[in-house]
């Protein structure tokens, strides 16, 4: 076995080397350096702990993330790199990072103030505008720094903005942030939290054509500002996935009540929430906006001090009452007259419910309450109850008769809208005043304070609100420089009663009212309401002085003490309308908060455990402008908590009994109303005074009369409807004669004037409409009610402040927490999904990039290989040609040498023969000379020798020259032959070389075309892969969305089942109590009108009992039918929701397929265009190549021609060959 196989078996050296990161310490135990001292929370990807450095004692927030692999570890490197690279006072700093035992520890700067959303939840109210300004400016500076460093945060929200104890903010959570490499780089990832996503980010879910840049953070900033102003972001009532469609298609969100906020704030939001990205301002531009010119962070320091204050909690149980206490003696109440146009019109279902309920003959009185909380009024019938009137539960509270509306049989929203009185829309400048008495909007947490002798808070059951599916509405707090307006407007949807608590105060004008929880248990009902305006100090004083004449004397007691305290600067009572966080369909009970600011010399705390209530008796009608309550959708009165701030100086605490004695029987102070002059006349009087005495009961001490309610209509100007505009100095209070009522339960609209009614018939009406087949009774509510009292003590700028918050604790609180937890779970699931999608997208992008690199590398290799192949062939051809030429030249040289030798040999022989002939001739001359005489012989010999020598020399030269010419001719002929042969070979070689070059170019062109095709196919396949992943991710999101929808629907069904079970269980008890009460009252009426004999009375009683049994049976059947209808409607609604969801999902899938088809088509068109352009460029390339070949061929021909001619110009010139083989001349020959 080889060593390499051995290594494979034991995996020696095969382990992948761990990647080292710059800011992450590996294989070091973080617990050796940091001590965990507590848990801060549970994030989407792991727990967050509070840690302390063992050496420096520096605190840190340690995020511990379980990472299974190196690939998962890389997902968090972007966050760590961004944190490490950022150095800004408003961005959290990275203190340390460890990777130990598959856990990634990220230790960041600890911010003790907590997140903005957590502070709002803790204090149960949104931020004020000054606080928002501070947060906004510092957040803008942080964003501007990030954007300058090419970083997009992509998850900006209140939960990611942290407070420090110094009153500054730190931007955190860069888990989904993007770090670009270029300034103008854009992104196309669908990532972030839906509620805060910019429209261009939302569009990336189905289309990557329009990527986004840094301005996506600016949109998120605008949404975050709305979140801080209203506790929840816009569209928070929607599912996290479904809100995306809302963002993409609807107009940019705005503040729910713009009039409560400054114009700078609204303009700033407008600049942030601009759907057109090009028109949206950048962070640097926004920093120049006047909204963020604030320099001090004092508002945040006060906020943090309050949020981090010491909290003392106290739970008070509500008193229990027996069922028998419901039965009250008749009250001497004057009868009311009813207008002929106010006849009740009941729905068909209510006809069936109450057809047997009209037993007693006379006028009945009914206080109805709008189901949406927008209006309520008192209705009086001058005939016996019609069969169509709803059967509503009635409680006798403090002598007043209240009728419980039928919550289960509400009309649909459109029906409510049609029945409401059409009220004039108030201008924005008067929204503050109108908001003070605006009704609680739909789905809001309504409260009533009611009992036998006092008024207590009564909460509507959470389940009924869920059933109604009313939108969750938010509260807004308005704060100007020197005036704070806070309002509490409470409606009990159980009793139809509405209590209005209005406190408008500034630093100079104060009206204090006390109503402690103990007073609610006193014999007399004491109620006060303080009303002031939002104008300047002088205007307020004038307005407060404008109390109706009939109420002045009794109002003095209520206002006198408050005025005294104001003059002395001792006590300030501020009622702040705040709101607890609300999940979809749920709200929290608004607690009453009291802030007591005491100086060092006097540390007295005045408790105010309940809101001041405006009693709504049977003669009063309260209505409000629908334009504010319904259309605006959010009211100050929808708060989850109400704070009353009381600052005490050296004034002693007012005794509760004194306050009671002063306020007992005193009317409520009411400001005058300025109404429009063109209102229609009404038959009701201009001023109405109502007194409802309460007779003593056997089980209780004799109660005092209910305080009179004086309403001045200001010379009967308010004669028509109530929706007239108000000026900025007034606060509208209800006038019973001008109100119209919309009863959503029975479809009945009626008005009542302020005449007296007959109690017997009122009770009869009450009994005929009682409890609406199982609605929660007041006694049940009182038994379930607990009051949670929180007291916060903290110091702001050396002044100790105490805040007391009283909140009624019901099941709705836990339900709210549960729904908020479920919503967080949904967001967490979405975050996980996004993280998985991002990882999968990164993996796919890496894979596709690798594929592109591989194919381009292959293209290059193929091209180089093809070129190398043809270059090699051309080189071989040239080498072969060279060798051939060299061989031929060698052959030609050898042949020429041989031929020259041969000719030379022949010429030498001929020359030798010629020389022999010359010798013979010389001999002959010698012989001839010898024959001459001797004396002449010597001279003749000499002369004849000279002649012979000359002639022979000339002959020999001629002979040699002739031989040379013959030799040159022969060699020339041979050379020409060789030249022709070489030219042919060169031409053939050039042709072969050009053919190879043509083949090379053709192969290159073919390769280029094939590469274009392959590149197109690859890009097409990659595009399909990308869209396949998008479809897969979209389907996963749809599955998650469907799963969440099914869970939501299942919760609704379960809640409805539980509520129906409770109603079925309550109905027999209610019926028994009713039967007992009705029988007692029937017998009492028989005793009063005792004209018949005892037998006749017994028969009437039997008949009444039979009718009661029949009525109860009908009630049970009606309840059963109602429950079936409710379940059927709910199931239909759930099915409709699922269908709508599937339709939206199909639209998204269809849109994605359309985008894919469009992109594929564009890709094909691009390929066709590219191919066309390539082919167009190919023709000139071919032409250029052929021209080059022709030029080279011509050059070769000219070369060979010129060479041949140059050598033939001088025939006597020796050739290159003959030069080396000279013919011997006469000088070289022997003689």
From Swiss-Prot:
This is STE20-like serine/threonine-protein kinase. The active site is at 155 (proton acceptor). The modification Phosphoserine is found at residues 14, 189, 330, 340-341, 344, 347-348, 354, 372, 507, 536, 554, 641, 661, 775, 814. Residues 309-351, 405-478, 516-757 are annotated as: Disordered. Residues 34-292 form the Protein kinase domain. It comes from Cavia porcellus (Guinea pig). GO terms for cellular component: cell leading edge; cytoplasm; perinuclear region of cytoplasm. Proteolytically cleaved by caspase-3. Autophosphorylated.
């Amino acid at each position: 076995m080889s060593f390499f196989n051995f290594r494979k078996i034991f995996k020696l050296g095969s382990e992948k080397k761990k990647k080292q990161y710059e800011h992450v310490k590996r294989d070091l135990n973080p617990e050796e350096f940091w001590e965990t001292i507590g848990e801060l929370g549970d994030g989407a990807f792991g727990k967050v702990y509070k840690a302390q450095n063992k050496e420096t004692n520096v605190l840190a927030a340690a995020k511990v993330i379980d990472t299974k692999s190196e690939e998962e570890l890389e997902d968090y490197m972007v966050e760590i790199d961004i944190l490490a690279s950022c150095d800004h006072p408003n961005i959290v700093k990275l203190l340390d990072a460890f990777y130990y035992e598959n856990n990634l520890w990220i230790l960041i700067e600890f911010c003790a103030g907590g997140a903005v959303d957590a502070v709002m939840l803790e204090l149960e109210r949104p931020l004020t505008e000054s606080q928002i300004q501070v947060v906004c400016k510092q957040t803008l500076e942080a964003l501007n720094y990030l954007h300058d460093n090419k970083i997009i945060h992509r998850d900006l929200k209140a939960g990611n903005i942290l407070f420090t104890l110094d009153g500054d903010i730190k931007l955190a959570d860069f888990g989904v942030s993007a770090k670009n490499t270029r300034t103008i780089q854009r992104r196309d990832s669908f990532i972030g939290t839906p509620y805060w996503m910019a429209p261009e980010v939302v569009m990336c879910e189905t289309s990557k054509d329009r990527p986004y840049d840094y301005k996506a953070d600016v949109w998120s900033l605008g949404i975050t500002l709305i979140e801080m102003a209203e506790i929840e972001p816009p569209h928070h009532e929607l599912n996290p996935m479904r809100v995306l469609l809302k963002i993409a298609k609807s107009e940019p969100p705005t503040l729910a009540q713009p009039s409560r906020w400054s114009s700078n704030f609204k303009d700033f939001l407008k600049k942030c929430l601009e759907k057109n990205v090009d028109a949206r301002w950048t962070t640097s531009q926004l920093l120049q906006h006047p909204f963020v010119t604030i320099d001090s962070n004092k508002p945040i320091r006060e906020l943090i001090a309050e949020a981090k204050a010491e909290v003392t909690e106290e739970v008070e149980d509500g008193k229990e009452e027996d069922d028998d206490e419901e039965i009250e003696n008749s009250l001497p109440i004057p009868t009311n007259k009813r207008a002929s146009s106010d006849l009740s019109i009941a729905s068909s279902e209510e006809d069936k419910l109450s057809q047997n309920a009209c037993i007693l003959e006379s006028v009945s009185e009914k206080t109805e309450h709008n189901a949406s909380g927008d209006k309520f009024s008192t209705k009086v019938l001058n005939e016996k109850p019609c069969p169509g009137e709803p059967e509503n539960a009635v409680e006798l509270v403090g002598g007043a008769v209240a009728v419980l509306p039928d919550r289960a049989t509400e009309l649909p929203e459109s029906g409510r809208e049609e029945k409401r009185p059409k009220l004039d829309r108030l201008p924005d400048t008067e929204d503050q005043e109108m908001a003070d008495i605006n009704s609680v909007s739909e789905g809001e947490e309504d409260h009533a304070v009611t009992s036998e002798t006092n008024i207590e808070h009564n909460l509507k059951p959470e389940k009924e609100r869920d059933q109604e599916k009313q939108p969750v509405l938010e509260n807004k707090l308005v704060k100007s420089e020197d005036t704070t307006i806070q309002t509490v407007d409470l409606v009990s949807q159980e009793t139809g009663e509405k209590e209005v608590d209005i406190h408008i105060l500034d630093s100079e004008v104060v009206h204090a009212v006390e109503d402690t929880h103990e007073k609610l248990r006193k014999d007399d009902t004491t109620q006060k309401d303080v009303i002031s305006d939002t104008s300047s100090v002088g205007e307020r004083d004038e307005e407060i002085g404008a109390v109706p004449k009939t109420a002045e004397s009794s109002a003095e007691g209520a206002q006198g003490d408050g005025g005294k305290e104001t003059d002395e600067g001792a006590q300030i009572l501020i009622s702040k309308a705040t709101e607890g966080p609300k999940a979809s369909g749920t709200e929290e009970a608004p607690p009453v908060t009291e802030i007591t600011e005491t100086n060092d010399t006097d540390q007295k705390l005045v408790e105010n455990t309940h809101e001041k209530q405006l009693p709504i008796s049977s003669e009063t009608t309260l209505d409000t402008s629908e334009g504010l309550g319904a259309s605006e959708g959010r009211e100050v009165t929808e708060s989850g908590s109400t704070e009353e701030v009381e600052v005490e100086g050296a004034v002693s605490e007012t005794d509760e009994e004194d306050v009671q004695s002063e306020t007992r029987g005193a009317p409520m102070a009411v400001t005058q109303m300025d109404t429009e002059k063109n209102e229609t006349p009404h038959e009701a009087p201009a001023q109405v005074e109502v007194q409802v005495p309460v007779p003593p009961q056997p089980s209780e001490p004799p109660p005092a009369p209910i305080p009179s309610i004086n309403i001045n209509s200001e010379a009967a100007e308010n004669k028509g409807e109530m929706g007239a505009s108000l000026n900025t100095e007034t606060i509208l209070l209800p006038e019973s004669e001008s109100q119209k009522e919309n009863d959503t339960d029975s479809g009945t609209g009626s008005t009542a004037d302020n005449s007296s009614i007959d109690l017997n018939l009122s009770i009869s009406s009450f009994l005929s409409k009682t409890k609406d087949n199982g609605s929660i009774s007041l006694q049940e509510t009182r038994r379930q009610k607990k009051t949670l009292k929180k007291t916060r003590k903290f110091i702001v700028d050396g002044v100790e402040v105490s805040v007391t918050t009283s909140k009624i604790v019901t099941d709705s609180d836990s339900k709210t927490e549960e729904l908020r937890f479920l919503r967080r779970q949904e967001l967490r699931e979405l975050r996980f999904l996004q993280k998985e999608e991002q990882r999968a997208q990164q993996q796919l992008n890496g894979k596709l990039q690798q594929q592109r690199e591989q194919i381009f590398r292959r293209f290059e290799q193929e091209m180089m290989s093809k070129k190398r192949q043809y270059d090699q062939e051309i080189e071989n051809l040239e080498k072969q040609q060279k060798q051939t030429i060299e061989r031929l030249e060698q052959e030609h040289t050898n042949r020429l040498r041989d031929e020259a030798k041969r000719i030379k040999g022949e010429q030498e022989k001929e020359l030798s023969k010629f020389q022999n002939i010359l010798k013979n001739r010389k001999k002959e001359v010698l012989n001839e000379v010898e024959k001459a005489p001797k004396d002449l012989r010597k001279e003749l010999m000499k002369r004849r020798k000279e002649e012979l020598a000359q002639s022979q020399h000339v002959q020999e030269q001629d002979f040699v020259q002739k031989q040379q010419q013959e030799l040159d001719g022969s060699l020339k002929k041979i050379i020409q032959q060789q030249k022709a042969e070489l030219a042919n070979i060169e031409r053939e070689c050039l042709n072969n070389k050009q053919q190879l070059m043509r083949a090379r170019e053709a192969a290159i062109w073919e390769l280029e075309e094939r590469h274009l095709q392959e590149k197109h196919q690859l890009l097409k396949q990659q595009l399909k892969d990308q869209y396949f992943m998008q479809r897969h991710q979209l389907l996963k999101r749809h599955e998650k969305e469907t799963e969440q929808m099914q869970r939501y629907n299942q919760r609704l069904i379960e809640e409805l089942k539980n509520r129906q079970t409770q109603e079925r269980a309550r109905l027999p008890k209610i019926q028994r109590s009713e039967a007992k009460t009705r029988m007692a009252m029937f017998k009492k009426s028989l005793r009063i009108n005792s004209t018949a004999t005892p037998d006749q009375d017994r028969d009437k009683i039997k008949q009444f009992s039979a009718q009661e049994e029949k009525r109860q049976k009908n009630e049970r059947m009606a309840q059963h039918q109602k429950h079936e209808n409710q379940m059927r409607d709910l199931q239909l609604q759930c099915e409709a929701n699922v269908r709508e969801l599937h339709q939206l999902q199909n639209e998204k899938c269809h849109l994605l397929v359309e985008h894919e088809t469009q992109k594929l088509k564009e890709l094909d068109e691009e390929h066709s265009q590219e191919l066309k352009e390539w082919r167009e460029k190919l023709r000139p390339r071919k032409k250029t190549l052929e021209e080059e070949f022709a030029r080279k061929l011509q050059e070769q021909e000219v070369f060979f021609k010129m060479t041949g001619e140059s050598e033939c110009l001088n025939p006597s010139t020796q050739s290159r060959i003959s030069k080396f083989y000279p013919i011997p001349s006469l000088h070289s020959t022997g003689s």
